Amino acid sequence: MISAEKAGRVKAVILDVDGVLTDGRVGYGGPELIKFFHYRDGHWLKLAVRAGLIVGLLSGRSSRANRERAAELGLSFVREDVHDKLEEFEKLLREYGLKPEECLYMGDDVIDLPVLKRVGVPVAVADAVPELDEAVIYRTAAPGGHGAVCETMRLLLKARGDLDGLLERYRR
């Protein structure tokens, strides 16, 4: 679970894309890769942005779909073709003036392990490889690409005390 203490420190949400925001499948057949994103994940990322969090993507693969989805959601950054995620994470810390404990990171595979070991709130999706268990404090019930990000953002925003205020506009 994500404690209120840890959640209260979070200033940035950093997500892997393939296997976290998507189910990990990649479609070929044309000039561009085809990816499918869950609408609820996107809506809850918008709520995280509305709560004042820095939200961005850190992906080992480059894709126009990643950039378009990030732009649509108003995310702060997209880093692609990243082969050393820890090195890129350290750059993000410097660029945004963040400390590792102020970050939530979601991953699904061993390439994410070094970053998961550094952040304050390390999260794995339900169908992540078991090797991530040594580093994460929460494993979602939902698999990647099927609401895992929604689930995590809901827990984070609730633990931070932001959720009721963000949902007020829907309760009128």
Regions inferred by a protein language model and the residue ranges of each:
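Substrate-recognition element of Asp-dependent hydrolases with the DxDx(T/V) motif
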Residues: L45-R69, E80, L116
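Mg2+-dependent phosphoryl-transfer enzymes with acidic/Ser/Thr/Gly-rich catalytic loops
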Residues: A4, Y28-H38, E72-L73, F77-R79, ...
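Alpha-helix initiation and capping sites
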Residues: H38-G42, G60, H83
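Active-site neighborhood of HAD-like aspartate-dependent phosphohydrolases
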Residues: M1-I54
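Short, catalytically relevant binding-site loops at active-site mouths
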Residues: Y28, R61-A65, K85
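Short, active-site-adjacent cap segments at secondary-structure transitions
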Residues: L21-T22, R64-N66, D112
